[in-house]
Amino acid sequence: ARAAARHYADQRIKVAKPVVEMDGDEMTRIIWQFIKEKLILPHVDVQLKYFDLGLPNRDQTNDQVTIDSALATQKYSVAVKCATITPDEARVEEFKLKKMWKSPNGTIRNILGGTVFREPIICKNIPRLVPGWTKPITIGRHAHGDQYKATDFVVDRAGTFKIVFTPKDGSSAKQWEVYNFPAGGVGMGMYNTDESISGFAHSCFQYAIQKKWPLYMSTKNTILKAYDGRFKDIFQEIFEKHYKTDFDKYKIWYEHRLIDDMVAQVLKSSGGFVWACKNYDGDVQSDILAQGFGSLGLMTSVLVCPDGKTIEAEAAHGTVTRHYREHQKGRPTSTNPIASIFAWTRGLEHRGKLDGNQDLIRFAQTLEKVCVETVESGAMTKDLAGCIHGLSNVKLNEHFLNTSDFLDTIKSNLDRALGRQ
C-alpha cells in the first residue's frame, strides 16, 4: 500500500509556481476544503500561499489578511478565492466584530485593479429562461466611477446648477450650466478617468483573446456624446494599436454597440461572446444574464487585470448561509459546489498557461468536463434539480443528491476520467 501511495504521489502534476488561496466563510468554506483535499491536491502538486479570509480572521487581523492576499496575488499572478461574508449590522452582532469590515472583493479589486468577468457554466439538461443561449455569454463590468462615485443632491428651491472644472495648471476655469431650476428637483455630477477606461479596455481585449470569442462594448454615445464617446474612442484606439492583429489571427472581432441595440441582440443571440459594459449597465445586465442562464450556482467570476497576466477566480455566489445553518444543526444539505470547483479550475488553467504546463491545463479542463457531464448524466444538487422539475416536486436521492454524495460522485468520475481507478 505504501508503494502504491508513493507511486500515486509521483503521478501528481508538478506546478512550478505558487497559487494564492483565499479561504472563505460558512457553507462554501466547508465545500472549499473538500474540493481542495479530494479533487485538487490528490492530482496536483502545487504550492498554495494560504490566506484565511474567513470573517473571524479578517476581524482578528483588522482586515490586513485581505490586503496581504491581494499583494500576494500581485506577486504570484494567480489566486483562487472562496466566497466570503461582507458584514452588515446583523453580522457585526453575530461575530462580535470590532467594526463593519468592507467587502473583501472590493478591497482586492481596489489593489489589483482589473475587471470582473462573470461566465455561466452550461449543462444541456438544465433549462434556461432564454433557451437560445446555448453558448456562454460573459459580461465584463467596468467597476469604477460613473453613478457609483457620483455626487448627487436634492434641490429644494429655484436656482442654477453649474459644473465647474478648475485646471491644476492655473489656467482659467471652465464652467457649464446644467440646468436652471424653476423649483425643487435633483442633480448629479459624475466622472471617469482615461486611465481606468484604458485598464478596462485592456482587460476586456485580453479576456476575449484568452477565450477566443468576439468582444462587444456597449454605451449610449448618441446621447452622452462626450462622456460615452470617450469610452468608445479609447476602446477603438487601444484595439487598433494593440489587439487587432491577434483578433484577426483568431478570426474574432471587436465592435462598439449602442446599449439598446446590444440588449436586443443579446436576447436573440446563441451566445459565445464577451460583452464589455459600463459600471451601471454591467451591474444590471449581469443579473439578467445569471437568471437567463438558470442558476447562480453555475456562475463563475474571474477578476482579470489589465496586464492580462494577473487573475483571481471565484464563484459568483455568496456563502450559502441558509444551508450553513442546517449544517450547523447536523443536517445534510444539498449545496451546489460547481462554481467553487470552477474557481479552482480557472485559476489552475491560468497558472498552466503562464507556466506552459499542458498537463495542468488538461487536468483543469478535465475536471470542468467531469462536473458538466456528471450533471448531464442526472446526478445533481437540489438547486439544479429544481430548475428541471420545480423545487416543490424534487425528492432526495430520486432527483438530487446531498452535498457530500454529489462531491463523491464527482470525485469518482474524475478519478475515472484521469484513469486513476
Curated annotation (Swiss-Prot):
The gene is IDH2. The modification N6-succinyllysine is found at K49, K75, K135, K149, K162, K225, K251, K353. Mn(2+) binds at D260, D283. Binds 1 Mg(2+) or Mn(2+) ion per subunit. Keywords: Acetylation, Glyoxylate bypass, Magnesium, Manganese, Metal-binding, Mitochondrion, NADP, Oxidoreductase, Transit peptide, Tricarboxylic acid cycle. Acetylation at Lys-382 dramatically reduces catalytic activity. Deacetylated by SIRT3. GO terms for molecular function: isocitrate dehydrogenase (NADP+) activity; magnesium ion binding; NAD binding. NADP(+) binds at T84, I85, T86, R91, K268, G318, T319, V320, T321, R322, H323, N336. The modification N6-acetyllysine is found at residues 14, 17, 36, 38, 49, 75, 124, 135, 149, 162, 168, 225, 232, 241, 244, 249, 251, 353, 369, 382, 411. This is Isocitrate dehydrogenase [NADP], mitochondrial. D-threo-isocitrate binds at T86, S103, P104, N105, G106, T107, I108, R109, R118, R141. It comes from Sus scrofa (Pig). It is found in: Mitochondrion. The lineage of its organism: Eukaryota, Metazoa, Chordata, Craniata, Vertebrata.
